[in-house]
Structures are given as structure tokens and as C-alpha cells.
Amino acid sequence: LIVRSKENLTHLIPEVREELEHLANLQVRDDELRFVFDPRYREYLTPDFRRFLGLFRFDMRYVHVSQENGQIAIRVRGPMLHCIMFEIPVLAIVSELRNRTKYPDAQLSQVRDRLYQKFEWLEKNATKEELADFRVSDFSTRRRLSQVAQREVVEVMSRDFPGVFVGTSNPA
């Protein structure tokens, strides 16, 4: 993790470590494996990858959280197969902990209001034809305010987005 701002996140180190430890307890459940083995998804997930999901566990030996140059530093080093799986959860954890501290009073109503303001702007500045071709997907897991807020955004987008909402990268 490279923090590109001057915002000091070192106070998050204990909570980041605690949340990362929870990852080590995660594993794909049997019902989830049945879901990914559904024939409808055959073209998206190879049999080897589906079997891999059943075996995979986050290995905390590869994650190092420290303070460097007055900033939080998170390094994941080890076999690529294991390290790449940490990227999104690590970024989501840091983002959510940071936002919980920075915006402790944030409300879902504020998230919805801001989203509807953006919808209004789009409707005012784009034609119906442009909106009919305007396709958007949600990829905000790494930078979301919170999981609850992201769920709300996805629900509102799927129901009320004036263009074409394609879906989300985060089905959970």
C-alpha cells in the first residue's frame, strides 16, 4: 500500500492488523462452491480455478503492516498466487477504517442524496439517446465509504440510474 496523500493513517495500524487477521479465517463455503460450479458460469471460471477457490486461504505470513516515514506501510510479499488475493481486501479495510474515523457521522441518506444529485446532473447534461448508451459498472470496493454504503449505491443504481447500470464487481 502506498499512501499518496499527506493524511496520516498510522493510527489505523492496530485495527488494520486486527481486520487482516480476520481474513485468515475466511474460506469459501460449500454453498458458495456449488454456486461457482453452476454450469451457467462455466465460461467464466475454469474448473481448476473453481477447485482452487475451495482450497485457498489467506496466509498472513505474507502480509507485513508497519510504519515507514511517518506513514502506514502494508507490504505483501510471497508467491503471486497468494499475494494477489490480498489487494482488494487490504485496500477496502484501510479505506473503511479511514472513512469510519474521518466521517464518523456519515449517513446513508447523505450517500443517496449525493447519488441522486449526480443523476440529476446527468439528466440535465445528457440527451436521452446518450443516456441510453451510457453504461456504468460499480468497481468501488477498494475505495468505498463502507460496505453498507456500497450496497446502498448498488441498489439505488440498479433501480434509478438514468443510464444503463451494468452491475458491480462486488456481489457481497
PLM regions and their residue ranges:
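Ordered alpha/beta subdomains of enzyme catalytic regions
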Residues: 1-172
